[in-house]
């Protein structure tokens, strides 16, 4: 257990360097998450006989990836950075990977911002290619938590988004303080558990859009629990009633999921 407790003292978040640029494990895990999510989508399309071509799915994931990156970064800038004014007056800095002449990559992404970017990209894609948005979103409802699992493991390997100080025996020492490995809690609850639930439930879904609505609700419960073990975002702390920004945004997401579920269910029962 001691080796586990001090894992950060023995693990380098940089996987390797190439031409002087450091490649972090987080970046590799992000790429792995995307590749596996796409592979899962293609598996489900074939397994469940969903009328979507492989080429169209590739195009969709390309659109979505752009939306996710833009949304995640802008969400962090506007909500979490504490320097929104600086970035808005110097927008070129939002995606600038250099700092004082050193390549540091793009740091700071927001999950809920990524969700907004993902939804906008899906809407635009479906209008462009005349696809059923709810059918695509249901497919993503299973693939997202599958890939998300590896994204949170990437956060753990990158030594970021630490948990709160604790005395549990499996705590990770971070700058001399024992903390919850909350990134792994999130990988399990927000990723793996939700994936398994929706993967198994997909055979019983009653209408298109049901899975993505359930995902929004399930994610809220999982994130709400995990936030009690995760250190609040620096500069924000607790917002109201002892809740973090992540919990508040997740509650909004849950409300939207419930609204969508009820609306689509009523439409389904009228058929």
Swiss-Prot record:
InterPro entries noted in UniProt: Lgt
GO molecular function, one term: phosphatidylglycerol-prolipoprotein diacylglyceryl transferase activity
Keywords attached to this entry: Cell inner membrane, Cell membrane, Membrane, Transferase, Transmembrane, Transmembrane helix
EC number of this enzyme: 2.5.1.145
Binding-site positions, a 1,2-diacyl-sn-glycero-3-phospho-(1'-sn-glycerol): 152
Pathway: Protein modification; lipoprotein biosynthesis (diacylglyceryl transfer)
Family, similarity comment: Belongs to the Lgt family.
Reported function: Catalyzes the transfer of the diacylglyceryl group from phosphatidylglycerol to the sulfhydryl group of the N-terminal cysteine of a prolipoprotein, the first step in the formation of mature lipoproteins.
Name under which the protein is recorded: Phosphatidylglycerol--prolipoprotein diacylglyceryl transferase
Organism, scientific name: Campylobacter concisus (strain 13826)
């Amino acid at each position: 257990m001691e080796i586990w407790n001090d894992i950060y003292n023995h693990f380098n978040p940089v996987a390797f360097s190439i031409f002087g640029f450091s490649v972090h494990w987080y970046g590799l895990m992000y790429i792995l998450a995307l590749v596996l999510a796409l592979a899962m989508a293609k598996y489900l399309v074939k397994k469940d006989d969903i009328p979507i071509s492989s080429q169209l799915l590739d195009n969709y994931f390309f659109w979505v990836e752009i939306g996710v990156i833009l949304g995640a970064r802008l969400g962090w800038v506007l909500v979490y950075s504490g320097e929104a004014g600086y970035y808005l007056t110097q927008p070129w800095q939002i995606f600038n990977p250099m700092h004082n002449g050193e390549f540091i990559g793009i740091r700071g992404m927001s999950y809920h911002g990524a969700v907004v970017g993902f939804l906008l990209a899906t809407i635009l894609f479906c209008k462009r290619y005349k696809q059923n948005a709810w059918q695509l979103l249901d497919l993503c409802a299973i693939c997202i938590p599958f890939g998300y699992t590896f994204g949170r493991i990437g956060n753990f390997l990158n030594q970021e988004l630490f948990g709160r100080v604790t005395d549990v025996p499996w705590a990770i020492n971070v700058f001399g303080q024992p903390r919850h490995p909350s990134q792994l809690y999130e990988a399990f609850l927000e990723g793996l558990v939700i994936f398994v639930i929706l993967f198994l439930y997909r055979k019983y879904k009653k209408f298109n859009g049901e899975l993505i609505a359930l995902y929004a609700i399930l994610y809220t419960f999982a994130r709400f629990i995990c936030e009690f073990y995760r250190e609040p975002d620096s500069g924000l702390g607790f917002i109201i009633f002892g809740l973090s920004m992540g919990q508040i945004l997740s509650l909004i997401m849950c409300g939207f999921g419930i609204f969508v579920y009820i609306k689509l269910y009523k439409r389904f029962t009228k058929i």
